[in-house]
């Protein structure tokens, strides 16, 4: 399932993706 897929992602990549989602939220908040 999705949880197993996420567990297979290295921590640095999870942090990278989290940074992207945070940036997208920040952009939407400014619009």
Swiss-Prot record:
* One record GO biological process: defense response to bacterium
Cysteine pairings via disulfide bonds: none
One Pfam entry for this protein is Antimicrobial14
* Keyword list, A-Z: Antibiotic, Antimicrobial, Bacteriocin
Q: Which InterPro entries does the UniProt entry name for this protein?
A: Antimicrobial14
Domain of life per record:
Bacteria
Functionally, this protein is described as follows: Antibacterial activity against several lactic acid bacteria, Listeria, Streptococci, etc.
Q: What is this protein called?
A: Bacteriocin lactocin-705
């Amino acid at each position: 399932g999705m949880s197993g897929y996420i567990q297979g992602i290295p921590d640095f990549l999870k942090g990278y993706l989290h940074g992207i989602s945070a940036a997208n939220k920040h952009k939407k908040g400014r619009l």
